[in-house]
Every structure is written in structure tokens, then in C-alpha cells.
Amino acid sequence: MGLTSQLLPPLFFLLACAGNFAHGHNCHIALREIIETLNSLTEQKTLCTKLTITDILAASKNTTEKETFCRAATVLRQFYSHHEKDTRCLGATAQQFHRHKQLIRFLKRLDRNLWGLAGLNSCPVKEASQSTLEDFLERLKTIMKEKYSKCRR
């Protein structure tokens, strides 16, 4: 049961169209989830959001979009790994403790989604300027909203 030469071009065309549709659809879904996570994170005011993080977004002029996403995921992972059990972040009350756990959960989700969007195995992160986690997340949200508007076109 071989394919005739007349069937091959339409099959390749359908395959290419399906791939482009799936890529655009996945881009749309992933970005929407990232933006929703960033909205939740930036609304939270916890003790940890005032701590500093390596601001790779300030020094991302000569990097590709994928490298920027990869580096953002890397610094977020470094941040939440270091501060997950940090007593400065845990707070004194049960409510502060709950907010901190929620913050870490959202940062892990954001990390996972950024890695998926980047599609890279690893990326180097050079020491750059520092900013608060709150400012970093706001800038990342702006970048993601711009990408989302381009993805929808």
C-alpha cells in the first residue's frame, strides 16, 4: 500500500498546516497561563516580594527571546529554592505562612511554564543588576503581554 506521488503534496500541506495551528494554539495557551500566574503573583504582597533577585531582564539586549525566558526561569528557580524555607519570608502569622507557600507554588508554576516556552536545556546566568522580585515580575508580565498580543495575530 504505497502512496502515489499525487497524494504526497496534499499530505505535506495538511501536516504543515496542522503543525502551525498547534504551535499557535500552544503559544496562546502557555502565554495566557503565564500571564494569569504573573497577575496572581503581582497582586500578592508578601515579605519575600521585597527581596532582591538577579535582574536578567535589564541586561537582555543581545539575547534571544528563548534565552531570556530560560534565564528568567533560572533566576526564579534560584530565588524560590533559596527562599522556600527562609525565615524572613515565612512570617510570624499563619496567614503570612500561607501566603508564602502560595507564592512559592506560583513561582514554581511560572518556572515550569517559562522552561516550556524557552525550549532550552540550560542557559548561563551572569551576575547582573538586582531588583526586587516584585519589580522583576512586573517587567516580566509586560514582556509576556507584548508577546501574547503578537501571538494572537
From Swiss-Prot:
**Per the UniProt annotation, where are the glycans attached?**
62
A Pfam short name? IL4
Spell out the GO cellular component terms annotated for this protein, sorted alphabetically and separated by semicolons: extracellular space
Range of residues in the leader sequence: 1-24
One of the entry's Gene Ontology molecular-function terms is: interleukin-4 receptor binding
- Say which family it is in: Belongs to the IL-4/IL-13 family.
Q: What is this protein called?
A: Interleukin-4
Annotated organism of origin: Papio anubis (Olive baboon)
Q: List the taxonomic lineage.
A: Eukaryota, Metazoa, Chordata, Craniata, Vertebrata
